[in-house]
């Protein structure tokens, strides 16, 4: 009986490295094959005006901030996920020197209350978020069809924003912008401009005896999710450094984020003035 138990125990311990290796392989596969984002399909009625736009919009791509070795160590020590680029930047700028005489030393430094991460639950487009232009022609006296195309009559600034007041709004907007861009595959910005005189060659035919209307809309995405806040502390214990997060709270939030350099068109022909 004793020999049987010993054989079982030895077999178990021999198999442990195999289980550990299998888990590491799974973790590596997750890292190398992250979940693909859901790319939004752009309808035919929506056109890219990047080349035609007379107002050059600045690129709003938010660069992914790389944490330093110390910052990565601190982030890994936190029980709450940290994605806030402003907090990561502050940690990158911090320097904590270890000393061989630090045995028994302990200190806790309060770094403030921060929005720690944002989790997206929905990214949905509204292709007619804001009306920005109307091209019109009266062809009621005409005997044949008349062609019109899009010409931006005046400069239009399209703004997005959060749907509710929230602490550290600018930091939250940065995290939401990153997630919305990943989920949609679109170029997004909380503010975009369409310049006067912007044109597209696409032709729309107004039949004889009709009024023709070509409406232009600025599209946007409606981003919804949850932001997590917490009080952040840095604990120094001997030569070890770690992050402790206390009083963690979560809050639902939404935002409208315009799509840069895109216009959605709607054409209609009618007998009467609209």
Protein language model features and the residues they cover:
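Sec-dependent N-terminal signal peptides of Gram-positive bacterial secreted proteins and lipoproteins
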Residues: 1-25
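Phenylalanine-focused residue identity feature
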Residues: 12-13, 19, 101, 136, ...
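Short, highly charge-biased, low-complexity peptide segments
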Residues: 20, 29, 59, 245-251
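Deployable pore-forming modules of oligomeric membrane-permeabilizing proteins
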Residues: 25-163, 187-203, 213, 219-221, ...
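Membrane-insertion modules used to breach or fuse lipid bilayers
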Residues: 143-202, 240, 247-274
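Solvent-exposed, conformationally flexible loop/turn segments
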Residues: 169, 208-211
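Domain-length functional cores that host ligand/cofactor binding and catalytic or interaction surfaces
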Residues: 211, 216, 220-260
